[in-house]
């Protein structure tokens, strides 16, 4: 349900002329949600909505009146905890609109910038879209590339390669 609500807000923001301003403000606010104290304050029933609104707006340098009204609407509807989800959804819709997709590369070791750029170029050609990849470290020996926006995932494991080579050699004998 929260994802549907966040999509609705994100879609409305994406159609605005001052979209970039909204997006940068939401990115700033989303970073505050990393603090447990901030979340506790927003979840508190003892703190009035107008104080929560004041706190949220105090995190921004000179927000526009339109953005203040947007945050006021969010707080009035008790949806302030959706701000990170709205930001995430807005980021995904923005990427989709610009034909840019974000993905992750999971590997045992962090990949170099050159390796990531090479993968991005090859995947961009394959999907006819701009692909951005983040390198993440995982525990297993496999390499996995995941592009959620495109529904694409590929995994390559040394163990499976060795097993296939053994099978091929045994068939050849």
Curated annotation (Swiss-Prot):
Domain of life of the native organism: Bacteria
Keyword Zinc carried by entry: no
GO molecular function ontology, one term from the record: proton-transporting ATP synthase activity, rotational mechanism
GO annotations of cellular component type: plasma membrane; proton-transporting ATP synthase complex
SUPFAM superfamilies reported for this sequence: N-terminal domain of the delta subunit of the F1F0-ATP synthase (SSF47928)
Keyword set, alphabetical order: ATP synthesis, Cell inner membrane, Cell membrane, CF(1), Hydrogen ion transport, Ion transport, Membrane, Transport
Family: Belongs to the ATPase delta chain family.
Function: F(1)F(0) ATP synthase produces ATP from ADP in the presence of a proton or sodium gradient. F-type ATPases consist of two structural domains, F(1) containing the extramembraneous catalytic core and F(0) containing the membrane proton channel, linked together by a central stalk and a peripheral stalk. During catalysis, ATP synthesis in the catalytic domain of F(1) is coupled via a rotary mechanism of the central stalk subunits to proton translocation. This protein is part of the stalk that links CF(0) to CF(1). It either transmits conformational changes from CF(0) to CF(1) or is implicated in proton conduction.
Entries under PANTHER family matching the protein: ATP SYNTHASE DELTA CHAIN
Subunit structure: F-type ATPases have 2 components, F(1) - the catalytic core - and F(0) - the membrane proton channel. F(1) has five subunits: alpha(3), beta(3), gamma(1), delta(1), epsilon(1). F(0) has three main subunits: a(1), b(2) and c(10-14). The alpha and beta chains form an alternating ring which encloses part of the gamma chain. F(1) is attached to F(0) by a central stalk formed by the gamma and epsilon chains, while a peripheral stalk is formed by the delta and b chains.
Protein's name according to its UniProt entry: ATP synthase subunit delta
Organism: Campylobacter lari (strain RM2100 / D67 / ATCC BAA-1060)
